[in-house]
Amino acid sequence: MIELKNISLSYANSHGDSQLCHIDLTVKKGELIILAGKSGCGKTTLTRVLNGLCPQFYPGTLTGSYLLAGKDALKMPIHQLGTMVGSVFQDPRSQFFTTNTTDEIALGMENIPLERAVMQKRIELVCAQMNIERLLNRRIFPLSSGEKQLIAIASICAMEPKAVSYTHLRAHETLRHL
């Protein structure tokens, strides 16, 4: 499913210092992996490589190979990679584009685009699976940080990507909904 071979990355402003050096990683369908390490060790950078933000939005030099579902992910347009790898960031507010929870969950599917009836079924299914129906049709910004993260996760899961990367999940509260 995900296969990284000899991935190295140096950000454009890093004066040649590598943020990732010769990373090999294979993640099979259905596997869950956890990247753990000290602050600054490259966990977020690796996530940015997986979802295509590096080097497209965070300029730098990326070498090695990255296969996603057997396809060369480094040659995919960012919009295609974005539908295959969903990302939930440390601060979910940074990825919200609406002020309503249901609208936010639907937004990514609107961009695919999917028919309204399909989107509604996916919203209902994902929210039921995560046991977060109580969060539908609410204003986003008064929600707790954990609830915001759950809405971000639901919005990604509703798009049915092949892989999802999470940066800094809020421990047990968020994990029990997955």
Positions of predicted regions on the chain:
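A short, flexible loop at the N-terminus of ABC-type nucleotide-binding domains that lies
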Residues: 1-4, 9-22, 54-59, 75-77, ...
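The feature captures the beta-strand-to-loop junction immediately N-terminal to the Walker
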Residues: 36-38
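ABC ATPase NBD Q-loop/coupling interface
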Residues: 65-80
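Conserved ABC ATPase "signature" region
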Residues: 117-135
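Conserved ABC ATPase signature
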Residues: 139-143, 147
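Hydrophobic anchor residue at the start of the ABC signature
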Residues: 153
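Conserved small/polar residues in nucleotide/adenosyl-binding loops
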Residues: 167-174
